[in-house]
C-alpha cells in the first residue's frame, strides 16, 4: 500500500477571461506534490464549489491519490443519486487532479499514461461569426491566414465562445442583417429573443455564399445548438448536404435524441452530439446505432478523464470519432485535459478551441502553444499546467446567470439556449 495520502482539497474560483472558472487543487503529504483539475460549471459555479468543499474534500482526505479508478467509482455513488452536472463537475476536478498527480509521480505526461501519442499536433477548429454572409466570409479568411483549416460558421445567432462579448446571442442578433424575425407581442418578457424558423432559413444561404467564395478546401462546422424543432433539424441537415460540412453540431436536444434515427435515414450530413450529455445512457445508444459521427461531450460534465477515456475507446470500437467540447467556459486545465485525450486517442476527430487572453495565460502558466491551427502541449509530467493562486485571486467570480441562457422565441416562450 502506498504511503502517499491526500492532505487537502481546495476549490479555486477565478475569472481572468471574464468567465467564471473552477479549478480543484489536491495536495498530498509529499512536499510540493499536488494536482489540478477543472470543475467548471459556469452557470452554477458556487454550487460546484460547495459540493467540492463540503462533500468531496472530507471524502478524499486521507485517501491514496494513486487509486484513481476506485476514487472515481466510490465518488460517483457516494451521494446515492448520481450523474448530475454539479456533482459530475466536482468529481471531474478531483479526477483530473489525480491524473495530474499520477503523471508527476511517474515523471510522464498524462497522454503517456493513456497510451502515448497517436499524433504530433492537435488540429483545431475556431469560431467565426458575423452579421451577414460577407462578414462571416471576411472573418473566415482572417482565420485561414492564421493557419486554421477548420472553422465553425455562425450568422446572426448564438456565436459561441469565438466572440469576446459575453452577451453572445444579443450581440449576434443585433448585427444580423439578413435574418428577419417574427414580431413579438406588445409586452415582452425580459430575455434574449430568437426566431428559430428565420434562423433555419438563413443557414443554407450562408453556406451557399461561403462555398461559392471560398471553395471546398476549408472545412466548415455549424452549431444548431439544439434550438430548432426535430423536423426543422432534419430538413436543415438534408439541405446542407450539398455544402459538405465537416459536421452539423447538436441538431436536436438531448430530450429529442430519438429523432436522430430519422435524421440519419434522410441525410448524409455528418452529425456531432454530446455537449449536454451527463451519463452513459445518453451517448451509448447513439454510438451503438451509429447515429452520430462525432462525440463531443464536455469532459468535466461527464466526470473527468477517467470516463472520457472509456468513452473514447468505446467510440473507437464503433467508428465514432471524438470532438471534445472546448468553449470559453472551460479552464485552461480542462483545455489541457482535452488535449491529453486528443493526443492519445486514435479515433480523435477535431478539437474545438477558444483563444485565451493574456490574463488567462498569466494565471495558468503552461497553456498549450497554438501555431497555424494546431495545438502543442509541453512534455512536462502530469497535465503540464499550473495556476498562480495570487494572480487568480485578482479575478473574482461573479456567479451570475449568463444572459445568453435566457432565450425566448418571438412570442415570448422560453427556449433552449
From Swiss-Prot:
Its cofactor is Mg(2+). GO terms for molecular function: gluconate dehydratase activity; magnesium ion binding. InterPro entries: DgoD-like, Enolase-like_C_sf, Enolase-like_N, Enolase_C-like, Mandel_Rmase/mucon_lact_enz_CS, Mandelate_racemase_C, Mandelate_racemase_N_dom. Mg(2+) binds at residues 223, 249, 275. It catalyses: D-gluconate = 2-dehydro-3-deoxy-D-gluconate + H2O. Substrate binds at residues 43, 127, 275, 296, 325, 329, 352. The keyword Isomerase does not apply. Pfam families: MR_MLE_C (PF13378), MR_MLE_N (PF02746). The record marks 327 as: Important for activity and substrate specificity. Binds 1 Mg(2+) ion per subunit. Has low D-gluconate dehydratase activity (in vitro), suggesting that it has no significant role in D-gluconate degradation in vivo. Has no detectable activity with a panel of 70 other acid sugars (in vitro). Belongs to the mandelate racemase/muconate lactonizing enzyme family. GalD subfamily. This is D-galactonate dehydratase family member SeV_A0456.
Amino acid at each position: 500500500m502506498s504511503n502517499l495520502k491526500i492532505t487537502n482539497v481546495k476549490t479555486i474560483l477565478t475569472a481572468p477571461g471574464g468567465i467564471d472558472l473552477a479549478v480543484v487543487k489536491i495536495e498530498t503529504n509529499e512536499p510540493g506534490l499536488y494536482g489540478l483539475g477543472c470543475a467548471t460549471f459556469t452557470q452554477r459555479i458556487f454550487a460546484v464549489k460547495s459540493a467540492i468543499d463540503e462533500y468531496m474534500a472530507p471524502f478524499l482526505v486521507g485517501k491514496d491519490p494513486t487509486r484513481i479508478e476506485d476514487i472515481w467509482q466510490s465518488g460517483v455513488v457516494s451521494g446515492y443519486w448520481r450523474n448530475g452536472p454539479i456533482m459530475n463537475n466536482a468529481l471531474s476536478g478531483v479526477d483530473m487532479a489525480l491524473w495530474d498527480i499520477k503523471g508527476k509521480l511517474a515523471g510522464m505526461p498524462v497522454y503517456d499514461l493513456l497510451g502515448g501519442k497517436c499524433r504530433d499536433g492537435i488540429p483545431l477548429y475556431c469560431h467565426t461569426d458575423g452579421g451577414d454572409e460577407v462578414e462571416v466570409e471576411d472573418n473566415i479568411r482572417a482565420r485561414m491566414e492564421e493557419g486554421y483549416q477548420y472553422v465553425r460558421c455562425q450568422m446572426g445567432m448564438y456565436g459561441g465562445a469565438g466572440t469576446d462579448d459575453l452577451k453572445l446571442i444579443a450581440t449576434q442578433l443585433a448585427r444580423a442583417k439578413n435574418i428577419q424575425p417574427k414580431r413579438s407581442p406588445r409586452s415582452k418578457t425580459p430575455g434574449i429573443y430568437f426566431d428559430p424558423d428565420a434562423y433555419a432559413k438563413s443557414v443554407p444561404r450562408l453556406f451557399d455564399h461561403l462555398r461559392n467564395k471560398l471553395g471546398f478546401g476549408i472545412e466548415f462546422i455549424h452549431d444548431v445548438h439544439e434550438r430548432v424543432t426535430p423536423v426543422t433539424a432534419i430538413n436543415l441537415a438534408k439541405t446542407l448536404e450539398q455544402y459538405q460540412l465537416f459536421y452539423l453540431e447538436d441538431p436536436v436536444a438531448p430530450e429529442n435524441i430519438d429523432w436522430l434515427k430519422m435524421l440519419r435515414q434522410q441525410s448524409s450530413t455528418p452529425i456531432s452530439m454530446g455537449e449536454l450529455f451527463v451519463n452513459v445512457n445518453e451517448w451509448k445508444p447513439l454510438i451503438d446505432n451509429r447515429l452520430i459521427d462525432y462525440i463531443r461531450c464536455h469532459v468535466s460534465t461527464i466526470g473527468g478523464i477517467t470516463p472520457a477515456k472509456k468513452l473514447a475507446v468505446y467510440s473507437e470500437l464503433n467508428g465514432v470519432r471524438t470532438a471534445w467540447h472546448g468553449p470559453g467556459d472551460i479552464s485552461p486545465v480542462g483545455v489541457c485535459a482535452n488535449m491529453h485525450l486528443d493526443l492519445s486517442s486514435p479515433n480523435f476527430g477535431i478539437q474545438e478551441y477558444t483563444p485565451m487572453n493574456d490574463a488567462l495565460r498569466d494565471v495558468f502558466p503552461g497553456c498549450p502553444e497554438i501555431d497555424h491551427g494546431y495545438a502543442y502541449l509541453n512534455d512536462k509530467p502530469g497535465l503540464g499546467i499550473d495556476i498562480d493562486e495570487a494572480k487568480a485571486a485578482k479575478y473574482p467570480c461573479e456567479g451570475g446567470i449568463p444572459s445568453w441562457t435566457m432565450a425566448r422565441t418571438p412570442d415570448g416562450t422560453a427556449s433552449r439556449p
